[in-house]
């Protein structure tokens, strides 16, 4: 007879450390849930355009709930066209499909496109109403250091996110909406022949051959240069966030270095299979003096490539095991 066991495992080895000049950073191996690096991970900071991911997440959610359609055409308000910076160059005479708006945000980082979606999804038809909705939804997703004042990351003293929250958000987009996530890897998007010089995706990792397929850059003078990135190599996916970098070129170099470090310094290994017995525990008043402790699921761990450290299995028995026993 065995008990199924969810145990605590401690890896004693070390990988080569990664030094980043970013003000804040977070690197996650999505496949195993292993956090590879944290720097000021919970500090609320200006997220710039990276916070557009929350607008996108909610739009994807509304589409899947049947509350919004990709082919639905939305009007463009005066409030939307007043935004400058990165835009789709929308006019108030336009009626734009939701699908074009999504690509306008993902590829072109359109501030105006965010507002069009926000006003359509807001409970009261305003961008502020949608921003409040974003904040409440973020809290339900476990993003405890995020407050939204607008839909596009336009500088505002109250508009903040932590890099950990951005990683949570990116992870949810990848996991929850694979059918829309592929848009993030698109290199170009041109809306109605407007601003042909502004059609390329700003993600510096796309096309480098390192598996990068998302997500979103951001920049303001206060926030510096940032990127929420993701890359898939084989069956492993890495998600990372950096912010507060000093230039566009530094951001590109830092992001590429992170991807290379995460994949080259760590590998996924299997240390046990479901129902494998990894230890024993004493039993009171039983026919047998001990019972086997088995894994409830496969044990796949992320470990440093060049480390031969050992895995320590620690099983914590919180209550005495008394006979009679049943499996499970």
List PLM regions with ranges.
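Glycine-centered loop/turn positions within well-structured domains
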Residues: 1, 34, 112, 298-299
């Amino acid at each position: 007879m065995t008990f199924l066991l969810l145990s605590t495992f401690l890896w004693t080895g070390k990988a080569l450390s990664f030094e980043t000049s970013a003000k804040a950073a977070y690197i996650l191996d999505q496949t195993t849930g292993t956090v590879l690096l944290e720097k000021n991970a919970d500090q609320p900071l200006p997220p710039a355009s990276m916070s557009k991911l929350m607008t996108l997440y909610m739009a994807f959610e509304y589409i899947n709930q049947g509350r919004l359609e990709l082919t639905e055409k939305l009007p463009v308000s005066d409030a939307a066209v007043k935004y400058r910076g990165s835009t789709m160059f929308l006019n108030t005479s336009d009626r734009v499909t939701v699908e074009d708006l999504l690509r306008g945000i993902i590829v072109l980082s359109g501030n105006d496109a965010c507002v069009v979606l926000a006003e359509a999804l807001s409970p009261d038809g305003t961008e502020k109403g949608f921003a409040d909705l974003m904040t409440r939804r973020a809290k339900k997703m476990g993003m405890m250091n995020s407050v939204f004042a607008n839909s596009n990351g336009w500088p505002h003293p109250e508009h903040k996110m932590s890099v950990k929250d951005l990683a949570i958000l990116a992870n949810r987009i990848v996991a929850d909406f694979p059918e829309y996530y592929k848009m993030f890897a698109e290199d170009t998007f041109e809306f109605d022949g407007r601003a042909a010089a502004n059609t390329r995706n700003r993600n510096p990792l796309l096309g480098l051959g390192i598996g990068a397929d998302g997500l979103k850059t951001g920049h303001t003078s206060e926030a510096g240069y940032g990127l929420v990135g993701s890359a898939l190599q084989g069956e492993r996916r890495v998600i990372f966030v950096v912010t507060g970098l000093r230039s566009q070129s530094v951001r590109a170099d830092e992001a590429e270095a992170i991807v290379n470090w995460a994949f080259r310094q760590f590998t996924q290994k299997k240390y046990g299979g479901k129902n494998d017995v990894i230890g024993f525990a004493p039993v009171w008043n039983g026919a047998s003096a001990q019972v086997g402790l088995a894994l409830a699921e496969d044990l796949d761990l992320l470990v440093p490539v060049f480390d031969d450290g050992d895995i320590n299995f620690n099983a914590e028995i919180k209550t005495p095991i008394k006979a009679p026993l049943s499996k499970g």
